[in-house]
């Protein structure tokens, strides 16, 4: 939970994971949580969840794969600021995507990132939508879909 505090600086308090959220997404059947460690200290995590877990989110209506059970949504991806730009995030994402590629019936990975970030991703990436002031952050985000 301490790691998610780093999100507050960029996006606001509501992006800090609560114990309830951690329990829901780290321990829920079907979730794909991965943790990065440096000298036994947790320095980051990534959580993937089936897109269908987000059935209460209005934006899921634009996702053509909703209900097909073939997409893992990247719910959270956080690395402590002092460990960014050192390859830790890249390695964590690589392990995560490698696991997704091995899952039967999972054809896509999707998520929300700040506008322009998905253009740096490798592979077949499609930007589906842009959202101004995403979740009240004051920032424009894009919803992307990656073919695995």
Task: Describe the predicted segments one by one.
Residues 1-21, 28-43:
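Short amphipathic alpha-helix that is part of the acyltransferase structural core
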């Amino acid at each position: 939970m301490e790691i998610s505090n780093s999100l507050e600086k960029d996006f606001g308090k509501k992006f800090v994971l609560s114990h309830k959220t951690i329990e829901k997404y780290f321990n829920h059947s079907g979730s794909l949580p991965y943790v990065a460690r440096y000298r036994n200290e947790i320095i980051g995590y990534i959580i993937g969840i089936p897109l269908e877990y987000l059935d209460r989110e209005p934006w899921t209506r634009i996702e053509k794969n909703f209900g097909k059970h073939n997409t893992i949504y990247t719910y959270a991806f956080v690395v402590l600021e002092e460990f960014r730009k050192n390859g830790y995030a890249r390695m964590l994402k690589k392990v995560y995507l490698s696991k997704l590629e091995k899952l039967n019936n999972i054809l896509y990975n999707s998520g929300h990132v700040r506008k322009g970030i998905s253009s740096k991703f490798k592979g077949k990436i499609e930007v589906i939508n842009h959202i101004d002031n995403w979740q009240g952050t004051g920032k424009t985000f894009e919803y992307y879909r990656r073919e695995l």
